[in-house]
Amino acid sequence: MEMLSGAEMVVRSLIDQGVKQVFGYPGGAVLDIYDALHTVGGIDHVLVRHEQAAVHMADGLARATGDVGVVLVTSGPGATNAITGIATAYMDSIPLVILSGQVATSLIGYDAFQECDMVGISRPVVKHSFLVKQTEDIPLVLKKAFWLAASGRPGPVVVDLPKDILNPAKKMPYAWPETVSMRSYNPTTSGHKGQIKRALQTLASAKKPVVYVGGGAISAACYAPLRHIIETFNLPVVSSLMGLGAFPATHRQSLGMLGMHGTYEANMTMHNADVIFAVGVRFDDRTTNNLAKYCPNATVLHIDIDPTSISKTVNADIPVVGDARLVLEQMLELLAQDAPSQPQDDIRDWWQQIESWRARQCLKYDAESESIKPQAVIETLWRLTKGDAYVTSDVGQHQMFAALYYPFDKPRRWINSGGLGTMGFGLPAALGVKMALPKEMVVCVTGDGSIQMNIQELSTALQYELPVLVLNLNNRYLGMVKQWQDMIYSGRHSQSYMQSLPDFVRLAEAYGHVGLQINRPDELESKLSEALEHVRNNRLVFVDVTVDGSEHVYPMQIRGGGMDEMWLSKTERT
């Protein structure tokens, strides 16, 4: 049996798990691991400029590929800097394994240099935290960590590694476990056949059905059976922010995103539905508005692998616990055996009503404006990339414009912080995607506020030659804050105007990249085309676009209202 130190066990375990990339930042508590990375080899390590960005990069990789992202940080401030990234992944159910250094076991609890209780601090925002106390436990703990992160409802797992168990002078027998199990953890994957049959019968008899798709559908990769059911029953489809791409956005039956800034037709369809078929969703507050007024006539069918998400906010009349792909495949088997009849006249009437809502063209904007509209920037990007880019975003108006005006026809192409709403996510996430998928076009849609949260990662991009397009919608404001202040706080712009902005073009050039400025609508097509060509030639391009600072994101639901209560413009409401 091979004899390895604890640090070597960490690296060998990652290799045996199939890990190709690790994102991290060294420090005293993990120097033995970094030395093992150098001597053992086999893993590409990306040296970030801030630990939060390391987690976002691993997160971007995980969202784009479905693989578990891996992070390595030191103890104390290295670990605490990672917390925002961990919480971001936790809220969106993204599989990560975070390896954090810790002071020696004999010093834990004595306020040693760079000591912090990483297990305790991370506990609210992880699936599980491990503190490894014995060198020989490292392979099994890491095997469990990867299994926990990827199985059931995915999420981040922290493995805290005290410095003394990594000692290079202390060699122990190494064996990578073939299988792993945990007595207290056994997620349900197949659905209850009786519940599935009830759900299928209810869906087939619905007069005003709607399918509501969330991020869980993407995690489960249930696209094929989902589409089969949707097309078989001619069902309208709405999506949460996290679910975009699970069903093709340009498909006739897609009504787009629902919720706070969802389309008029999506929100109206939800409000008036008699059956909601929810797949991998949380019914979070951004998609329900006032729960007391939520979809008053709907029977709710809810498929989710996490039983705690079912009936958490919205009562499920027919709950089905299980992996969405397996449950939908079970549903198709039942459908093949005994297809229930469907009221075709009712469905035709329902679609006529939906088309009347769609005819309002809720996403129209002033395309002839002398100033650049952010909507036009995103539409131009979509056209030039043929809708085939991997798009990351930060948080704010630009995020909503990207979600509404870049139709995603494929899953895992839309990568954003949906649950936590983390500014500074977009750039490092884009670099993580590019690291994993070097041949793909990767675009970070950001704003003048968000980009400055982690702009230092432009240095990481240069070091590792990660050519992405950074598209900065620069409105000189914290745009979404300003929009709320305009609409709710009588236009009092308290601390939302971004004074003393840098020259982003020259800043990008200082980091060694290409910088481009767009100030007029007639420049959009040519300069974005130029930017994309630079990216194809292996250069990161930072495009600073001066957009109309007065533009709002519409539709916007009215606070405290139902799904059907929205502002459609500054002067028009439902």
Swiss-Prot record:
User: Where on this chain does thiamine diphosphate bind?
Assistant: E51
For activity, the cofactor(s) needed are: Mg(2+); thiamine diphosphate
Q: Which domain of life is it from?
A: Bacteria
Which top-level enzyme class is recorded in the Swiss-Prot or TrEMBL entry? transferase
Tell me its EC number(s), please: 2.2.1.6
Oxidoreductase: present as a keyword of the record? no
The entry's Mg(2+)-binding residues are D448, N475
Q: List the disulfide bonds.
A: none
Q: Where is this region: Thiamine pyrophosphate binding?
A: 397-477
InterPro entries linked: Acetolactate_synth_lsu, AHAS_TPP, DHS-like_NAD/FAD-binding_dom, THDP-binding, Thiamin_PyroP_enz_cen_dom, Thiamin_PyroP_enz_TPP-bd_dom, TPP-bd_CS, TPP_enz
Catalytic activity from the UniProt record: 2 pyruvate + H(+) = (2S)-2-acetolactate + CO2
Q: How is the cofactor bound?
A: Binds 1 Mg(2+) ion per subunit. Binds 1 thiamine pyrophosphate per subunit.
Question: By what means is the activity of this protein regulated?
Answer: Sensitive to valine inhibition.
> Where does the chain bind FAD?
153, 261-282, 304-323
Keywords attached to this entry: Amino-acid biosynthesis, Branched-chain amino acid biosynthesis, FAD, Flavoprotein, Magnesium, Metal-binding, Thiamine pyrophosphate, Transferase
Name its pathway: Amino-acid biosynthesis; L-isoleucine biosynthesis; L-isoleucine from 2-oxobutanoate: step 1/4; Amino-acid biosynthesis; L-valine biosynthesis; L-valine from pyruvate: step 1/4
This protein's assembly is summarised as:
Dimer of chain H and chain I.
**What else is noted?**
S.typhimurium contains genes for 3 AHAS isozymes: ilvBN, ilvGM and ilvIH.
Q: Which family does it belong to?
A: Belongs to the TPP enzyme family.
Q: Which PANTHER family match?
A: ACETOLACTATE SYNTHASE CATALYTIC SUBUNIT, MITOCHONDRIAL, THIAMINE PYROPHOSPHATE ENZYMES
This protein is called what? Answer: Acetolactate synthase isozyme 3 large subunit
